[in-house]
């Protein structure tokens, strides 16, 4: 047996003797290392004989072929195993921390594993759906929704629902319960204690004609049922002057001083508050507002009208800070409150006043009845306003669908809940859209069809009729953090007022997304795409003070959008007692289909903003806005040079912003969309672009709407341009020191936005 083993072992190495080389610790004298040949003891005798024969016979060289083959096989196997292990370990490192690397040796599945495998095969997980599939699912959900049922219910069960009333609160709790039934991730509400102005119960508001010489009563014109909130409560008397719509241009075209006089203007074009502010700036003592037949074709001539005169949003008696019950600020009031009385009158009352006026109006001002400019010399108008302040509690209702990956980033969808009067078009449509969208999107999430990366917040606001009070107070309460989390606001108020046109007002950051949406959504009446004009961006109107989206954009720096289906003329019943479901359904016979289209518009925006890894906000659109401003400023180069100033730094700021957007676009293209950390860092830079256009050089309390493009005040770019125009028109009213400040601060605000967009301070490369 030993012989066989030795033979096999020896043959494995080609029959060669086994040897090794030993290196001694001490060198030999001749410098050679000792060489020892190791032999098997049993072979010694054979080797002796072999050595004896070697003296006579030449030694044959042993064959080494078998040894080479063996070494090669061992090397190949070794390299294969090493490569396999390296690949396996590299794979294990890529697996998420929660996943353990499985053993390479297959084992028999346990009984539990077999059961789980069986269940997985029979009940596969719903795959994550993307835009094309979600668009179809949303459409199917909208097709089975009856929007008019909700609108009608709100009109029958919760009207009228003035802010703070029992019906307003009851509707709020109804919406809160609905959100819970829809199984939203979380539902809650917050309370605010605000001051609104209502008609006095002890004395009526009135408009009368009196004799010029004795102020004796000629005859009463009207004791209106409607009123204008936040008017000054007082009595004034003076001649009456017609100023068309009360715009700044109308007062310029009037070419007649209005100081010491009352002004009568038509409703429309601009808000009540702006009309009053324009008249007050020219020292008028009071304002009357009416709806003419040409723009508001209401058959009933004595329909009362409601509005507000606060040139701002939120509670005007807590400007810049939230009106929570526990806040203890000293008494203060907004600078946007008027110091003159304001009152709405019916068309019938306006006709009586025009019957006692003279001098023809400009041709472009002609209305449906004889248009006269000024009251007759023998008669004056007396206006009495007895409105009183009232403190009320309002509720804002919220529900959220939490995002799967970035729940701390959210889009907000909101609608006004209250209304002076029935409010079918003003608030019922928006509330219906809000409720049904929440239900449809929540169902899609529950079924595993829709997995939004970011959260969706649904909000029902109160006191919207008094200047977006509910929305603004909420923004003021969370001013320090909202711009870091909320990246878009979608307003649903007054979304359906007609069928012919689709109008949109929005931040430039949303233009590209809106255009894609318009290409996908069709007008249900015409069957045509909402995208009908490639030049639509140039026709976008600024958000007005009366729009709840305005404070999100101009106060908080959150991109916002407001849209509506409408006609060429204004919807005539807003703010009146005729804003009912019956009137709306007659005015818009395809009401349910139009409401479905409005919900589809909002739904498309919500889904696109929450499913993609990249944030769908086109920051490059502001390059065009800044360039337009620079071009406008270039028209005043001579004036600026005469003042010893230069536009060089403005050019540099504009260039830095352009380079910052280009660099960010390059970063976007180079990063892998699956690299969530880098994508989030880039998205955070994008979502703050709007915020960085809020001027840091003015106080949110003194000038709450700090946005240099869309805000209000001397810090805005439009105010800077208007001030330069004043130098050419009326140099005595021009303030050079103010202009220097305006130019410097506007330049630095743009530069600050460029720096913020660039990212870290070591990435900033500008000429300042």
From Swiss-Prot:
Residues 577-768 are annotated as: Ligand-binding. The keyword Amino-acid biosynthesis does not apply. It is found in: Cell membrane; Melanosome. Residues 90-768 are extracellular. Glycans are attached at residues 259, 325, 730, 735. Cellular uptake of iron occurs via receptor-mediated endocytosis of ligand-occupied transferrin receptor into specialized endosomes. Endosomal acidification leads to iron release. The apotransferrin-receptor complex is then recycled to the cell surface with a return to neutral pH and the concomitant loss of affinity of apotransferrin for its receptor. Transferrin receptor is necessary for development of erythrocytes and the nervous system. Positively regulates T and B cell proliferation through iron uptake. This is Transferrin receptor protein 1. The lineage of its organism: Eukaryota, Metazoa, Chordata, Craniata, Vertebrata.
């Amino acid at each position: 047996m030993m012989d066989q083993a030795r033979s096999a072992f020896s043959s494995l190495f080609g029959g060669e003797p086994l040897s090794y080389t030993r290196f001694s610790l001490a060198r030999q004298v001749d410098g050679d290392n000792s060489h020892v040949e190791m032999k098997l003891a049993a072979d010694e005798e054979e080797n002796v004989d072999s050595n004896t024969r070697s003296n006579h016979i030449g030694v044959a060289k042993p064959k080494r072929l078998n040894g080479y083959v063996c070494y090669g096989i061992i090397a190949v196997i070794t390299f294969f195993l090493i490569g396999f292990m390296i690949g396996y370990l590299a794979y294990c490192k890529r697996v998420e921390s929660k996943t353990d690397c499985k053993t390479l040796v297959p084992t028999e599945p346990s009984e539990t594993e077999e059961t789980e495998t069986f269940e997985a095969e029979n009940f596969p997980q719903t795959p994550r759906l993307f835009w094309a599939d979600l668009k179809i699912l949303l459409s199917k959900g909208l097709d089975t929704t009856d929007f008019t049922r909700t609108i009608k219910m709100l009109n029958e069960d919760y009207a009228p629902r003035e802010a703070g009333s029992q019906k307003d609160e009851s509707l709020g709790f109804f919406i809160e319960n609905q959100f819970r039934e829809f199984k939203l991730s979380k539902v809650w509400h917050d309370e605010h204690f605000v001051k609104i102005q209502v008609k006095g119960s002890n004395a009526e508001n009135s408009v009368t004609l009196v004799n010029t010489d004795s102020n004796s009563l000629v005859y009463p014109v009207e004791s209106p049922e409607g009123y204008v909130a936040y008017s000054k409560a007082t009595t004034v008397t003076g001649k009456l002057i017609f100023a068309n719509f009360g715009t700044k241009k109308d007062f310029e075209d009037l070419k007649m001083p209005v100081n010491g006089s009352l002004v009568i203007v038509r409703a429309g074009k601009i808000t009540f508050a702006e009309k009053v502010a324009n008249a007050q700036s020219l020292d008028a003592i009071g304002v009357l507002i009416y709806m003419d037949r040409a723009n508001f074709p209401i058959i009933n001539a004595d329909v009362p009208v409601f509005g507000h005169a606060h040139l701002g949003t939120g509670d005007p008696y807590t400007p810049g800070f939230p009106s929570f019950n526990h806040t203890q600020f000293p008494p203060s009031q907004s600078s946007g409150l008027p110091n003159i009385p304001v009152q709405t009158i019916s068309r019938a009352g306006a006709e009586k006043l025009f019957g006692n006026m003279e001098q023809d109006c400009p041709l472009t001002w002609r209305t449906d009845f004889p248009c006269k400019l000024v009251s007759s010399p023998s008669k004056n108008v007396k206006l009495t306003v007895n409105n009183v302040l009232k403190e009320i509690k309002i509720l804002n209702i919220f529900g959220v669908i939490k995002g799967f990956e970035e729940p701390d980033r959210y889009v907000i969808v909101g609608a006004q809940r209250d209304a002076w009067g029935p409010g079918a078009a003003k608030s019922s449509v928006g509330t219906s859209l809000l409720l049904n969208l929440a239900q449809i999107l929540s169902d899609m999430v529950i079924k595993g069809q829709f997995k939004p990366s970011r959260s969706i917040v649904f909000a029902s606001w109160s006191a919207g009729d008094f200047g977006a009070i509910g929305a603004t107070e909420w923004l003021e309460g969370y001013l320090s953090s909202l711009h870091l989390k909320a990246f878009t606001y979608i307003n649903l108020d007054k979304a359906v007022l007609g069928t012919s046109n689709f109008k949109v007002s929005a931040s430039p950051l949303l233009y590209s997304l809106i255009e894609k949406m318009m290409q996908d959504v069709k007008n249900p009446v015409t069957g045509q795409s909402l995208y009908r004009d490639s030049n639509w961006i140039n026709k976008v109107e600024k958000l007005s003070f009366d729009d709840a989206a305005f404070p999100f954009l101009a106060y908080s720096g959150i991109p916002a959008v407001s849209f509506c289906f409408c006609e060429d003329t204004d919807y005539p019943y807003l703010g009146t007692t005729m804003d009912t479901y019956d009137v709306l359904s007659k005015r818009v016979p395809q009401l349910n289909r139009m409401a479905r289209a409005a919900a589809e518009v909002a739904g498309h925006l919500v889904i696109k903003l929450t499913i993609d890894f990249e944030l769908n906000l086109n920051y490059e659109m502001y390059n065009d806005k800044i360039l337009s401003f620079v071009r406008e400023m270039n028209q005043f180069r001579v004036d600026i040079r005469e003042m010893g100033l230069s536009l060089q730094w403005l050019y540099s700021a504009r260039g830095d912003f352009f380079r910052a957007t280009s660099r960010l676009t390059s970063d976007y293209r180079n990063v892998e969309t699956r690299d969530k950390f880098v994508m989030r860092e880039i998205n955070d830079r994008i979502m703050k672009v709007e915020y960085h256009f809020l001027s840091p050089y003015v106080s949110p309390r003194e000038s709450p709407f700090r946005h240099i493009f869309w805000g209000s005040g001397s810090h805005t770019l439009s105010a800077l341009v208007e001030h330069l125009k004043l130098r050419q028109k009326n140099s005595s009213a021009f303030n050079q020191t103010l202009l220097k400040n305006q130019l410097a601060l506007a330049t630095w605000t743009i530069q600050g936005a460029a720096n913020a967009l660039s990212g870290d301070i070591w990435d900033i490369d500008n000429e300042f």
